[in-house]
């Protein structure tokens, strides 16, 4: 199944609430970005101030240099999936074991400079790989579709891996993302910056749903 996941990328609690209430009103699966202001150039609110809605599948994308610093808090939020960066200081096999004990899936995110080969050793510990084709901590920007070359390599290394895409997804490039093997497409400004985000979401969802 292919998923369109509206993203929540907020720099303050007010924006977080606004974005979260909007996208969770129409999308069954959403993607929340958390930034530390160090690994990522922008900073999201303190995770202690955040919450996630019931009845919605939530992926949390942790753009932190030290994800362990907030791991306990994230686990308490009970998301479906926590994604950490290959470039972070996380001990991913250990982190994955902790998450598994709490019934939470583990994802690994790859910045453009990180190859599929670089993360091959952690793939047996993960259920999801996020190919990053945008800019850390911001909505908007162009998708670097050259990063899609990683999709085939990742799936060759682990056939059951769920592949996600983050960065510049829109109606024009959805087909190319799906053809490359991406099944979870995280969408920011292409939904948030339209006159009717719910209608745009429905249009995108229909485009990636097989007839």
PLM regions and their residue ranges:
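Active-site/ligand-binding-proximal alpha/beta "capping" segment
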Residues: 130, 134-135, 141-184, 190
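Conserved N-terminal beta1-alpha1 strand-loop-helix module at the mouth
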Residues: 1-83, 87-91, 98-100, 105-106, ...
């Amino acid at each position: 199944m292919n998923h369109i996941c509206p993203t929540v990328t907020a720099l303050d609690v007010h924006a977080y609430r606004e974005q979260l209430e909007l996208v969770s009103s129409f999308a069954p699966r959403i993607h929340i970005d958390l930034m530390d202001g160090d690994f990522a150039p922008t900073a999201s609110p303190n995770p202690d101030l955040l919450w996630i809605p019931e009845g919605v599948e939530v992926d949390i994308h942790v753009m932190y240099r030290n994800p362990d610093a907030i791991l306990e808090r994230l686990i308490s939020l009970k998301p479906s999936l926590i994604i950490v960066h290959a470039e972070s200081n996380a001990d991913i096999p250990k982190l994955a074991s902790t998450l598994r004990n709490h019934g939470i899936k583990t994802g690994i995110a790859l910045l453009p400079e990180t190859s599929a080969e670089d993360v091959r050793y952690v793939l047996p510990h993960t259920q999801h790989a996020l190919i990053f084709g945008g800019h850390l901590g911001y909505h908007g920007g162009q998708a670097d579709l050259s990063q899609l070359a990683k999709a085939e390599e990742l799936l060759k290394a682990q056939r059951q891996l769920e592949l996600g895409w983050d960065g510049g997804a829109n109606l024009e490039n959805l087909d190319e993302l799906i053809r490359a093997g991406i099944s979870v497409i995280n969408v920011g400004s292409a939904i948030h910056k339209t006159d009717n985000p719910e209608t745009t979401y429905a249009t995108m969802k229909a485009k990636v749903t097989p007839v």
